[in-house]
Each structure stands twice: as structure tokens, then as C-alpha cells.
Amino acid sequence: MKLVAGLGNPEARYENTRHNIGFEVVDELARLHQSSFSSGKGNFLYSKIIHRNEPILLLKPMTYMNLSGNAVIAAMTFYKIEYQDILVVCDDLNIALGTIRMRAKGSAGGQNGLKHIIQCLKRDDFARLRVGIAPDHPVSSYSSFVLGKFNAEERKITDRMVSLSAEAALDFVAHGVEHAMNHYNTGKKTQQ
């Protein structure tokens, strides 16, 4: 079984914010497979889907972003999933809006949810899909920016980026992280 964990914050006030793009990606995967989310044996929501005969656990931590590792560890323990079989999907302030980047390992890059997962796993060699949300203009507060919603023009790009991210996640499941990196790390932005 593979685990695809989309990071975000619970509560309706955070819905459709830049920081919750990970939730949007796992929501899209569930929608594509006509599945819905249920409460898990831990502080998370989950959905089980199958892609190319591979079972996938979709996960939305309900711990708030900065404690995402608690939910990921709980799901991995309960479902007996190894670190090599997880993909974490999160926002990235350093990548342009419309661009996604798959990585096999690495630092948190300033993303606190990813940082907490690395701390809880005590390793950084697990796959992650970074979804670009970088502003195209100066911002006075990055905290306010990531907790803000996309404007109408950004939303058009974001919708395509969420679809592309869902495709990349399924490619990871079917073919592995190296294959997904080769096919989705093109540096091209989703067209406006």
C-alpha cells in the first residue's frame, strides 16, 4: 500500500488557502476515484483508492500544518506503511505558481509540515511533491500570504496545477519517484 499525504490545515476558514493546496490534491485524487474521506485511527481523515491494482491511502492530517508528522506516523503505523511508500504533497513558497516539483529526499525548505514529518520519521529520504505557490509580487507577511486565498486568475492556474499534481502522484504510485521526477520536473509552468 502507498500513502499519499496532502498537507493543510483543518477548519473551514483555511479551505482553499494557498497552504492547503496539499488537501486539494488528495481531494482531487479521491474525486477521480469516486471516493470520500472518513475519520481515521488517529488525527487524520483518510480515503482508500486503487490505481493500477495498487492500493493507496489518501491522508489529510487534522493536526494543523506544523504537527503533520503526528498524523503521518499514526497512519504509517496503523496501516504498516514503510517510508519508501509515502508521498507528501505540500505547498512551496520557493516555487512559482503553476510549477510542481517531485523530490526523492531533501530538506523541508522552510515548509513546517514537511519539517515536522522529517522530525517524526527521523529521516528525509521519502518522496515529496512540492506545489508552487510563490508570489509574483513582494509580500509584507509570508504567513498572511500562505493563509490567504488564491485570486480568480491564480485559481485558474491552481486548478490545472492540482490536476497535474494528482497525475504526478499517480505516476509515483505506478512507476516510482524517479519516473515521476523525470516526467513532471520539467520546469514548465501550467499554462495560463
Curated annotation (Swiss-Prot):
Keyword annotations from UniProtKB, A to Z: Cytoplasm, Hydrolase, RNA-binding, tRNA-binding
PROSITE patterns reported in the protein's UniProt record: PEPT_TRNA_HYDROL_1
Site residues (Stabilizes the basic form of H active site to accept a proton), renumbered to this chain: 91
GO MF term (any one): peptidyl-tRNA hydrolase activity
Top EC class, one word: hydrolase
Classification via InterPro entries: Pept_tRNA_hydro, Pept_tRNA_hydro_CS, Pept_tRNA_hydro_sf
GO CC, alphabetical: cytoplasm
Main location as per UniProt: cytoplasm
Catalytic activity: an N-acyl-L-alpha-aminoacyl-tRNA + H2O = an N-acyl-L-amino acid + a tRNA + H(+)
Oligomeric and partner information: Monomer.
Protein name: Peptidyl-tRNA hydrolase
Organism whose genome encodes this protein: Prosthecochloris aestuarii (strain DSM 271 / SK 413)
Gene field: pth
